[in-house]
Amino acid sequence: KKLYLNSLSVVGINPKNHDIRFVEDDWESPTLGAAGLGWEVWCDGMEITQFTYFQQMAGYECKPVSVEITYCLERVCMFTQQQKNVYDLLWNDEGVKYKEVFHQAEKEFSAYNFEHANIDDLLKMFDMHESEAKSLVEKKISLPAYDQCLKASHVFNILDARGVISVAQRTGYIGRIRDITKGVAEIWLSSQTK
């Protein structure tokens, strides 16, 4: 905790001048069969960091437990640059703003994900990535299998954003991805113990 608070000082946020709170926020990724204890760190009421102690991955206990510290860099910069809007952040010393770098991509990907993604093609892509991942798991090729699993998960997220997956279907899709993840973990762990 002390090391983390010192890191805030290094980037220009003096913890003595702000209301810093550690708020319990355990993490879970059902598609990955992953979970862990976690905390959000709030600065003056806004989340700026997430701590996660990964205790389970693909349904397996993590030994040892690993930790991830995720700084919400844009939010940290909002404090250090004293900005209320992320798009007003300076991106570089030449005066280029965050909006100039990222706004178009955010608009276009939002339009794609929520309005224009071809549902029929995405359903086929999900099946294709799932099939490829299963085939690679059978061949005991873990990393490309995991890559295909991540692609299937990404397609699932777009389908979910489009609102085409019912509650019952959602559970089924999550289970399908988790099954692949577990298979990948089994062959990975097996390869590491040889």
What are these regions (language model features)?
Residues K1-Q192:
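Structured aminoacyl-transfer and RNA-binding surfaces used for tRNA recognition/handling
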